[in-house]
Amino acid sequence: MSSICKGDNSDLTEERKNATFDTDKMAAVIYGREEIASRRRQLTESISRIHELAESKPLVFMTREEKIAESCRKLEVLSRHWNQTPFNRDNEEDALHIYREVLGMEGHPLALHDTMFIPTLVAQASQEQQEKWLGRARRKEIIGCYAQTEMGHGTNLRKLETTATYSPDTQEFILNTPTITALKWWPGALGKSSNNAIVVANLLIKDQNYGPHPFMVQLRDEKTHIPLKGIVVGDIGPKMAFNGADNGYLGFNNHRIPRTNLLMRHTKVEANGTYIKPSHAKIGYSSMVKVRSRMAMDQGLFLASALVIAVRYSAVRRQGFLEDKTQKVKVLDYQTQQHRLFPSLARAYAFIFTGFETIHLYSQLLKDVDMGNTSGMADLHALTSGLKSVVTHQTGEGIEQARMACGEHGYSMASYISEIYGVAIGGCTYEGENMVMLLQLARYLVKSVELIKSGEEKKLGPMVSYLAAKGGHPDLSSLNGYVTAFEHMARRQAWKATEKFLKLMETGESREVAWNKSAVELTRASRLHTRLFIIEAFMRRVSRIEDIPVKEVLTDLLHLHVNYELLDVATYALEFMSSTQLDYIRDQLYLYLEKIRPSAVSLVDSFQISDMQLRSVLGRRDGNVYENLFKWAKSSPLNKSDVLPSVDKYLKPMMEKAKL
């Protein structure tokens, strides 16, 4: 049962009493195991006792400068109180959870330090380099970011323009951004906060370009924080969201760094300029793969946050009547509201479970690479490319539905859903634009189909082995039947897109033109393949659950998920599934909406997202929305005076003049 406290809204209390499972046990399933869920609660509790972390006013009422100053103030407070928390500075998950609790989703100076800068040092710096920089980074003696994207180049790494030219005479790399479009653009915390960056630049030796490589670059003096000679750096301005972060630009004019600042775990440049290539051509992409490998979980938590708000508020908000004309109905009792929210709730769980799988696959990949085995690189790169695209897009859709489900109050910043949306939707373009990501996965699918056509299906990776299977009609009486249906649709679309691409080349089109003319069909194949993987990940997680009440409700949520997902792509089932089967799937969806309804509030409570982190008046744990909405509105800076200076200066004279 969810926690119930004296003074809670009676409707939310009623919902929580209806729970058939223990939310702490559900949290253990969500976050992997009981120790992790318990640790998150301990961290949240310890942080709540540090009163200096309280905000003087809601973040949404702060200017951008105030937000950045507030995040810096809180980081300094945290640095003085670490010993009051069970925080482990070497644990990335600890850091991410604490920052979400304390700093919310507005961004902060350490956002990329812990998620990109340190992990890249771990994955790509040599032992000697780690001894030099990693400890300092973890102790926060230096603050770093990851600078790859340029003003004119994002997803296409091979077209990056920043150069690092090696000088054998001085054993230095000379960094330059030769054009305006070569400026590094967008990296978080680059503008004003970071004094170091891992910069991705083309490595040039004796006029030969060896492609993009990561370099450790000091940007600012460690005492004065003034940019070093040959470096121009600054903030790129306000954004759709995430305005507590100083996303920046960075340019170089013959800036010199030592040869040993090239990250050398997998590749080296000798003093005489000899280049030693990595064991795999795309080993340098591991930092991107790392970020993408956890994006499913991060986006799932963004979606979860929006659903905590929308589901709780829908249980508190009453509107209209059904059979009982004496009492208004909870909005959550309307089937349309359930249909709007519950499929997204299922997706949030599915994305988090999928994220844990891909994080595990990435960890295994790092171990394999250290042993000289890079065979899993292509598989994981393809998978995370597809997941990144599908999950970010569906998360954006789900958050927007959650906002609209809150009615007019969802449009207010008091709901905080618009901020969650703005942060989450950025994932559709950072770390690779979504359409490009789908096409990267499509290349992998096309190669797989070509292997089958040439009789080499034994070379297929496990994630695409279904492409060689024979189709069959699904038995929808079991979950495996839904997997069979999805496999059939994904397989047929992958073959259809590949055949179109190959046929265009046979008619004389170049590979590039044929690819472009097949691109829409190829992206459809990638989406279906990815959605199949998500369903299977959800099923695998549910199959391992031991607690019976938790397993029962998640099995219901899984049934809701597969029925909704199959209906969502029903056009691909033409000539494969009958209208009777589709009607059955639709009826099953409505059945599972009803089954999930009594557990909805406890399912969102199980994410255990605190009020401090949620920052939402509508999604408060206690459900006391309306009195706090009025309190929130009164705290608006416009209400400091009854008459605004602009009224005295402009509107009153205008009205007086109109009376003459």
Curated annotation (Swiss-Prot):
Binding of FAD, residues: Y146, A147, Q148, T149, G154, T155, G188, R317, Q337, Q338, H339, R340, E433
SUPFAM superfamilies recorded: Acyl-CoA dehydrogenase C-terminal domain-like, Acyl-CoA dehydrogenase NM domain-like
Gene source species: Caenorhabditis elegans
Domain of life: Eukaryota
Induction remarks: Induced by high temperatures (25 degrees Celsius). Induced by starvation.
Binding partners and assembly: Forms a heterodimer with acox-1.1; the interaction may be important for the stability of acox-1.3.
Phenotype of gene-disrupted mutants: RNAi-mediated knockdown abolishes production of dauer pheromone daumone 2, severely reduces production of daumone 3 and increases production of daumone 1.
Gene name of the encoded protein: acox-1.3
Gene Ontology molecular function, alphabetical: acyl-CoA oxidase activity; ATP binding; FAD binding; fatty acid binding; flavin adenine dinucleotide binding
EC numbers on record: 1.3.3.-
EC main group: oxidoreductase
Pathway assigned to this chain's UniProt record: Lipid metabolism; peroxisomal fatty acid beta-oxidation
One Pfam family named in its UniProt record: Acyl-CoA_ox_N
Protein name: Acyl-coenzyme A oxidase acox-1.3
Keyword set, alphabetical order: ATP-binding, FAD, Fatty acid metabolism, Flavoprotein, Lipid metabolism, Nucleotide-binding, Oxidoreductase, Peroxisome
Main location: other
Cofactor(s) needed for function: FAD
